[in-house]
């Protein structure tokens, strides 16, 4: 029988992202190891589906282009390192507001690297920005929610699971396209 840490190391060889599945919260460190993080908050996530079509540019090609040509890529990498330290503190402190602010800021900075690449491109669409605005609007009304995005147009909503039902109800009134609840 292998320990979770040993299984993580084996999984890492097959897929960089698969090893995160062994922990509720995990961080990939610079030395290649994966660290389990602790937080007393119970997070939920839903996806506001903007577009289900295949991306025009793959994540791998996009990242290579950003690394090679984006004038803001190095600044984003430094920001990500700083955000990593801040995020670990916020998780330890169970500070959902800080977690959400870091999440949004870093996602926007990452997407900003695409517009300074040559040739420039964007995964985000007008509807992506509309989805982000919905999250901001609900937050201004007292809902505890923040957005994030990976390399694509869809917007993920981070929230506390205890708020899921009322948040889903409110988002459904504003977002008329598909919503996916990500269950644990």
Q: Which sequence ranges carry the predicted segments?
A:
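C-terminal nucleotide
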Residues: 38-184
């Amino acid at each position: 029988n292998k320990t979770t840490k040993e299984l993580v190391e084996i999984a890492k060889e097959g897929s960089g992202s698969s090893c995160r599945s062994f922990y509720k919260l995990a961080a990939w460190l610079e030395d290649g190891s994966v660290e389990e993080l602790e937080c007393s908050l119970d997070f939920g996530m839903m996806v506001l589906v903007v577009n289900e079509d295949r991306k025009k540019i793959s994540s791998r090609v996009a990242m290579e282009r950003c690394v090679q040509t984006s004038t803001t890529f190095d600044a984003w990498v430094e920001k990500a390192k700083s955000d990593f330290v801040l995020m670990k503190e916020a998780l330890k402190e169970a500070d959902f507001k800080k977690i959400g602010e870091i999440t949004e800021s870093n996602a926007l900075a990452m997407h900003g690297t695409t517009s300074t690449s040559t040739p420039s491109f964007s995964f985000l669409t007008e509807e992506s920005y509309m989805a982000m605005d919905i999250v901001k609007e609900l937050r201004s009304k007292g809902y505890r929610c923040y957005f994030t995005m990976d390399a694509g147009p869809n917007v993920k909503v981070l929230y506390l699971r205890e708020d899921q039902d009322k948040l889903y109800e409110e988002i459904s009134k504003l977002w008329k396209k598909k919503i996916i609840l990500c269950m644990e």
